[in-house]
C-alpha cells in the first residue's frame, strides 16, 4: 500500500514537472528521493528508499560528529557573536540610542 502511494506520488510530481528534485520514478519501478541534477553532493544521500518489490530498505549507517568537531564549530561562532554584540552595544551607547540605567540601588 505504501509503495503504491509512493509510486503514485512520484508519478504525479514527475509528471507535472513542478519539482524534479523531490521524488523520481526509476527504471524498474524503484522510487528514489534526492536531487536529480548531475552535480555531486558533499553530503552522502540515499537515492533509493524502496526496493522493486515494495520493501523499505534498512536505515543507512549514521555518521557521528564527535565532540571535537562540534566544539570546533560552536566555540568560534560564540566568540564572534559576543564580539559583534559587544561592539553593537557600544555603538548604541555612544550615540545615546540605548543607555542602560542602574535602578538596582533602590534599597
Curated annotation (Swiss-Prot):
Motif (GXXXX[G/A/S]): 81-85
Stretches of the chain found on the membrane's Mitochondrial matrix side: 48-65
Membrane topology: Single-pass membrane protein
Annotated transmembrane regions: 66-85
Domain of life: Eukaryota
InterPro entries reported for this sequence: MCU_reg
Molecular function as annotated in GO: channel activator activity; protein-macromolecule adaptor activity
Record text about domains: The GXXXX[G/A/S] motif at the C-terminal part of the transmembrane region mediates interaction with MCU and is required to activate the calcium-conducting pore in the uniporter complex. The poly-Asp region at the C-terminus mediates interaction with the polybasic region of MICU1.
The name this protein goes by in its record: Essential MCU regulator, mitochondrial
Organism listed in the record: Bos taurus
Organism phylogeny: Eukaryota, Metazoa, Chordata, Craniata, Vertebrata
Amino acid at each position: 500500500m505504501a509503495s503504491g502511494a509512493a509510486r503514485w506520488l512520484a508519478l504525479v510530481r514527475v509528471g507535472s514537472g513542478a519539482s524534479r528534485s523531490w521524488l523520481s520514478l526509476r527504471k524498474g519501478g524503484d522510487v528514489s528521493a534526492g536531487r536529480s541534477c548531475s552535480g555531486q553532493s558533499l553530503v552522502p544521500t540515499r537515492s533509493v528508499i524502496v526496493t522493486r518489490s515494495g520493501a523499505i530498505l534498512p536505515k543507512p549507517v549514521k555518521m557521528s560528529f564527535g565532540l571535537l568537531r562540534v566544539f570546533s564549530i560552536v566555540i568560534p561562532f560564540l566568540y564572534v557573536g559576543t564580539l559583534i554584540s559587544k561592539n553593537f552595544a557600544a555603538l548604541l551607547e555612544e550615540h545615546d540610542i540605548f543607555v542602560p540605567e542602574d535602578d538596582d540601588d533602590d534599597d
